[in-house]
């Protein structure tokens, strides 16, 4: 996997990232006191930034052999489904407990402001399929770590975990240290 997007030179890539970062709304003390919530709805409202994010993901993976994109509930669906469509591959949702209608495999985890369980359909991934997991944001790494465990339980081969935003100070990478990680943006010290 390339360190940056193959068809975007470094200065253009940085300009795009700076423009996208400028559209992220930061909401202090939400959903609980002490948390700065990075609101991506502003990225979705602006057609240029939404397209740029989707294009960056597509450019990164367009030359790779990928079988399925796994998107994490709920904002990972927004980018993961577009990526799957553009790549011509299947999309597998990872949902909060009780939201999938068929037989599931579940994984509990701790996140930045609580506890949660996520699930995936037990027939969503076949042994050896090449998978990219997509979510909007990586903070403490609890959600992505649980999603990685679910994909591995089903026999998927994770090529990379991809995020629009990463909060490196919360050390989420440590929970998935054995995975390749791609983040379009980082918000440090916040």
Residue locations for each model-derived region?
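PRPP-dependent phosphoribosyltransferase catalytic core
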Residues: 2-16, 145-190
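Active-site-facing substrate-recognition patch
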Residues: 2-66
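Residue-level signature of catalytic and energy-coupling elements of molecular machines
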Residues: 34, 69, 91, 161
């Amino acid at each position: 996997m390339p360190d940056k997007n193959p068809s975007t030179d470094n200065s253009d890539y940085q300009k795009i990232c700076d423009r996208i970062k400028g559209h992220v709304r930061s909401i202090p003390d939400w959903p609980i006191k002490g948390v700065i919530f990075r609101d991506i709805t502003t990225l979705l409202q602006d057609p240029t930034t939404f397209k740029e994010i989707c294009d960056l993901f597509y450019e990164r993976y367009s030359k790779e052999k990928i079988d399925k994109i796994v998107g994490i509930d709920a904002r990972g669906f927004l980018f993961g489904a577009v990526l799957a469509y553009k790549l011509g591959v299947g999309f597998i949702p990872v949902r909060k407990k009780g939201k999938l209608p068929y037989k599931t495999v579940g994984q509990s985890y701790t996140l930045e402001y609580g506890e949660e369980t996520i699930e995936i359909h037990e027939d969503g991934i076949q042994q050896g399929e090449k998978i990219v997991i997509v979510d909007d944001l990586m903070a403490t790494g609890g959600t992505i770590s649980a999603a990685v465990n679910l994909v591995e339980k089903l026999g998927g081969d994770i090529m990379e975990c991809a995020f629009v935003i990463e909060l490196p100070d919360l050390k989420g990478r440590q929970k998935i240290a054995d995975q390749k990680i791609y983040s379009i943006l980082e918000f440090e010290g916040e």
